[in-house]
């Protein structure tokens, strides 16, 4: 199997593993901060065990080399865990993932300011359409019982934080960022521990906590590894699968209808990003053909 095929498979399975994330939050019968604690703690422990098992302690030195930007990455990733749970608890799953779909747009903006990369005209046009889609989603939150603008704001924070974190990974590309993941998740769990009672009702939800953490750990690691072997447009297209699959999963299992405004705004976001990424993918493909000819 080539590195390219490996990258496609790893990224695809990474998307599949993170897709049920919002469903687990809905299924676990506990308060949001407790869910966030166990989500962070179990994912952090599992990633740490996997890192030690497969690479030993040699990657630990990355923690001492990543500097302020690396610790900022840890903060951003760690803070998204409670913010994600708060988002899912306060608005529809469809709203959350549709807002997440705008992540490449914010990543482009951060790349412009941090990496000094120019924003192509194609991306500028996409930003306008995606912004209109997000406005429609926000409006729908005032018209729908399952949606709320507070949850939308939490989802927006997670979207912006992940986009910033992805940009920092590119800034620190000479350093392995995987050891920072357990630090981020376990650091988040440590702080959340003082704001919740995580062992109340633990027996009732123990299985779901562990499975939830396993899915997050595997999905996070796969999405940190897979995109290194494929182009950014291909990675973006694969990650968009979650935007379609997650609300469908919750709709089928929990009968959560997102509302027409959310569907309309989300469709605008997904369609704009799909066209933009397909154009970029074809451009990269044409470029590679010219090089080989």
Regions found by a protein language model. Give the residues of each.
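Helix-helix packing/entry segments at the starts of transmembrane helices
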Residues: 96-102, 169-187, 217-252
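C-terminal transmembrane-helix exit sites in multi-pass transporters
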Residues: 84-86, 103-125, 244-264
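Hydrophobic/small/kink-forming positions within alpha-helical transmembrane segments
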Residues: 19, 74, 78-82, 104-109, ...
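Hydrophobic transmembrane alpha-helices of multi-pass small-molecule transport proteins
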Residues: 47, 51, 77, 122-141, ...
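C-terminal-most transmembrane helix of multi-pass membrane proteins
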Residues: 40, 51, 139, 240-293
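Glycine-/small-residue-enriched transmembrane alpha-helix faces in small-molecule transporters
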Residues: 1-37, 41, 75, 83, ...
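Transmembrane alpha-helices of multi-pass small-molecule transport proteins
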Residues: 30-79, 106-107, 161-165, 182-198, ...
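Loop-to-transmembrane-helix transition segments
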Residues: 6-14, 58-83, 149-158, 193, ...
């Amino acid at each position: 199997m080539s590195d390219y095929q490996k990258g496609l498979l790893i990224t695809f399975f990474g998307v599949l593993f993170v897709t049920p994330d919002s469903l687990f939050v809905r299924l676990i019968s506990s308060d949001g901060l407790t869910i966030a604690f166990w989500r962070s703690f179990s994912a952090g422990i599992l990633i740490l065990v996997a890192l030690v098992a497969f690479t030993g302690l040699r990657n630990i030195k990355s923690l001492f080399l990543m500097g302020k930007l690396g610790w900022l990455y840890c903060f951003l990733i760690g803070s998204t865990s409670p913010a994600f749970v708060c988002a899912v608890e306060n608005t529809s799953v469809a709203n959350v993932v549709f807002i997440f779909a705008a992540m490449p747009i914010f990543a482009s903006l951060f790349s412009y300011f941090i990496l000094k990369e120019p924003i192509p005209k194609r991306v500028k046009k996409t930003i306008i359409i995606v912004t209109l889609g997000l406005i429609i989603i926000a409006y729908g939150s005032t018209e729908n019982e399952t949606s709320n603008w507070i949850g939308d704001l939490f989802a927006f924070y997670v979207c912006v934080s992940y986009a910033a974190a992805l940009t920092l990974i590119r800034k620190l590309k000479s350093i392995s960022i995987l050891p920072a993941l357990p630090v981020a998740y376990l650091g988040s769990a440590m702080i959340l521990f003082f704001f919740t009672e995580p062992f109340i009702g633990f027996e009732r939800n123990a299985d779901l906590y562990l499975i939830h953490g396993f899915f997050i750990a595997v999905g996070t690691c796969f999405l940190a590894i897979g995109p290194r072997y494929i182009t950014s447009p291909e990675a973006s297209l694969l990650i968009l699968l979650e935007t379609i699959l997650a609300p469908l999963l919750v709709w089928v299992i929990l009968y959560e209808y997102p509302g027409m405004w959310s569907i309309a705004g989300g469709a605008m976001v997904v369609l704009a990003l799909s066209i933009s990424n397909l154009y970029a993918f074809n451009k990269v493909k044409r470029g590679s053909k010219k090089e080989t000819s």
